[in-house]
């Protein structure tokens, strides 16, 4: 796909091997380029506080992962961001020096990073694609954002709805591709914690093929708000624990 031109100004993807989600995003942005602006779409302070209250459950569930990741990526001039399902950044933590650079491109709480506001970017494009993805350097549609390398993964509710996005963003010259795996793993853990929080009011089933991994990030969780029966695939036994609040009961494999 050499010289893949997408905008009236002649802007084109720098890579001939751009991932399909990036190409689709550039095509969407090219058709709406006249509506994309470098100026951020930001909430007023009062509106941001109201949104933080609306998303208190996800913020509470994500806090351990945000703190852990922020400590891990601080030395790499990076930030950990939590955005809501519309793309508005709710929280940013990490390298204090990079926080100042990030502010220059409006990578801060209260600003919408929806794709129709900020062009191709990990938060907004992950929401549209409903999948974890990386947007590195010049893959960003807006040139001012091309200093960034961003890695975002959706956080899903027990019903599969997207509750928000966990993102690791940093200097494009220093970020590593494994940041996407970190973001994806932590987004799953946040989703599990949302279920556990709901489990204070109802039952949830924790399962894994190995009993020793029932408390790992790779475990599976099923939430039951009303009494019911859980069916398992034939020939696929697993170890399970039925939990409610702080109580647990082992189930036979």
What does each model-found stretch correspond to?
Residues 138-142, 209:
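Short, solvent-exposed loop/turn elements at beta->coil junctions and helix N-caps
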């Amino acid at each position: 796909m050499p010289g893949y031109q997408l905008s009236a100004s002649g802007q084109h993807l720098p890579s001939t091997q751009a991932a399909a989600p990036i190409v689709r995003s550039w095509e969407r942005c090219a058709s709406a380029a006249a509506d994309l602006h470098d100026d951020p779409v930001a909430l007023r302070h009062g509106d941001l506080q109201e949104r933080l209250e609306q998303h208190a459950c996800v913020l509470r569930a994500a806090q351990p992962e945000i703190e852990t990741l922020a400590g891990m990526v601080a030395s790499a001039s990076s930030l950990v961001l939590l955005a809501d399902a519309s793309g508005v950044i709710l929280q940013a933590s990490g390298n204090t020096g990079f926080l100042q650079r990030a502010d220059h491109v409006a990578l801060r709480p209260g600003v919408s990073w929806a794709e129709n506001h900020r062009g191709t970017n990990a938060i907004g494009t992950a929401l549209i694609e409903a999948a974890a993805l990386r947007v590195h350097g010049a893959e960003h549609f807006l040139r001012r954002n091309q200093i960034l390398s961003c890695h975002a993964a959706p956080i899903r509710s027990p019903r599969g709805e997207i509750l928000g996005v966990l993102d690791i963003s940093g200097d494009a010259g220093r970020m590593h591709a494994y940041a996407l795996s970190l973001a994806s793993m932590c987004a799953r853990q946040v989703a599990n914690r949302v279920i556990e929080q709901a489990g204070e009011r109802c039952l949830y089933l924790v399962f894994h093929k190995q009993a020793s991994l029932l408390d790992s990030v790779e475990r599976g969780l099923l939430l039951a708000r009303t009494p019911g029966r859980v069916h398992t695939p034939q020939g696929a036994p697993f170890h399970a624990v039925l939990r409610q609040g702080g109580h647990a009961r082992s189930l036979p494999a």
